[in-house]
């Protein structure tokens, strides 16, 4: 090989290695206003190279328009973005709905970083009710008390129904062959299964969850804004209006499924315990948020909520260590984290 050809090959390789891509990050607050001066720590990794030594760190700030642009080599991809600014909830961006890990990464990203307004004491709890005889019956309206953290009588010790749930399910045809059914029934490990257990296993199902409220003016509204990479996933204040008196959700084990992952599903705001003025306006109400989705299937219901006990206070920022629900004897540290959140998950 001649020296001229070797030099040409070297030049081509170097040119390919330095050919880069331009990236632009835009940081906005919960009102879609640009955030200037936000500190950025951006980590890029070389594709198909697990070595930390191949990564690149960029540290800078957003400009007056809330944006920051930078370039990277063609073989580098975004791996992690940390965003900080005093008075805002910090963000750790590694995997989002848009996905900086997507198969076809974009060159422009917009991320929300909500302001820290006035964190306060809230009732915060992760509800996870599984199938137990008489605990969560289907085709029955079940009231849930956000302040007590329990279903109302006769299914729990709750006193006031903030919200009412109605679960139902129906078979949607067999999902396995008759031979597979016979094999499962002959399995010694499944000898304690009931006929209902086998019916649930061997069939596809349709599920429906209805949500309603006991008094006029109360309701629920879906919140499209979602920052799963941020300490505060939803806007800090519940909206003043727009609440629906009821909501029905349906899904099937055949799909398509309405949500791919808990962290990618926004949530809901709720207005409950409403007292109306003589002119029909809302004189008093309590506000709650459900972070993520309402999971329901057969005799199972789970959701995470944050309830403000102060009437007419729409603020729903949980202050660290200010969860009104406290640890009690018999709850493990893991359960304390899961069921008594100290911050928004």
Which residues are covered by each model-predicted region?
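A domain-level signal for the mature, folded cores of soluble proteins
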Residues: 116-279, 305-315, 323-345
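A short, solvent-exposed loop/turn motif at the edges and junctions
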Residues: 55, 75-99
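Short, acidic Ser/Thr/Gly-rich low-complexity loop/linker segments typical of extracellular
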Residues: 47-71
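Beta-strand-rich domain onsets/edges
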Residues: 9-33, 41-43
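Short, ordered, surface-exposed loop/turn motifs in non-cytosolic proteins
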Residues: 31-50, 76
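Structural motif
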Residues: 23-36, 116, 130-135
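Sec-dependent signal peptide recognition
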Residues: 1-10
């Amino acid at each position: 090989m001649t020296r001229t050809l070797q030099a040409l090959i070297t030049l081509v390789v170097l040119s390919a290695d330095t050919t880069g891509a331009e990236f632009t990050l835009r940081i906005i607050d919960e009102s879609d206003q640009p955030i200037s001066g936000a500190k950025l720590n951006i980590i890029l990794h070389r594709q198909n190279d697990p070595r930390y030594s191949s990564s690149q760190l960029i540290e800078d700030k957003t400009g007056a328009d809330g944006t920051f642009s930078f370039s990277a080599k063609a073989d580098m991809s975004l791996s992690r973005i940390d965003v900080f600014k005093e008075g805002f909830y910090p963000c750790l961006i590694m995997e989002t709905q848009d996905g900086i890990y997507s198969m076809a990464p974009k060159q422009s990203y917009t991320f929300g970083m909500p302001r820290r307004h006035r964190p306060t004491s809230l009732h915060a709890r992760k509800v996870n009710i599984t199938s137990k005889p008489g605990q969560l019956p289907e085709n029955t309206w079940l009231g849930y008390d956000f302040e007590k953290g329990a279903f109302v009588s006769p299914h729990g010790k709750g006193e006031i129904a903030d919200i009412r749930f109605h679960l139902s399910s129906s078979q949607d045809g067999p999902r396995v062959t008759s031979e597979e059914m016979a094999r499962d029934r002959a399995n010694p490990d499944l000898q304690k299964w009931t006929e209902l257990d086998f019916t649930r296993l061997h069939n596809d199902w349709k599920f429906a969850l209805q949500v309603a409220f006991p008094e006029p003016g109360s309701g629920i509204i879906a919140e499209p804004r979602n920052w799963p990479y941020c300490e505060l996933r939803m806007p800090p204040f519940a909206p003043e209006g727009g609440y629906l008196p009821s909501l029905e959700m349906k899904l099937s084990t055949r799909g398509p499924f309405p949500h791919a992952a808990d962290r990618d599903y926004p949530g809901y705001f709720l207005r409950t315990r409403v007292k109306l003025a003589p002119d029909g306006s809302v004189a008093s109400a309590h506000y709650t948020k459900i972070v993520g989705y309402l999971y329901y299937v057969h005799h199972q219901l789970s959701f995470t909520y944050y309830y403000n006990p102060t009437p007419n206070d729409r603020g729903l920022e949980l202050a660290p260590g200010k969860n009104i629900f406290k640890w009690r004897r018999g709850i493990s540290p893991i359960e304390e984290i899961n069921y008594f959140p100290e911050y928004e998950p």
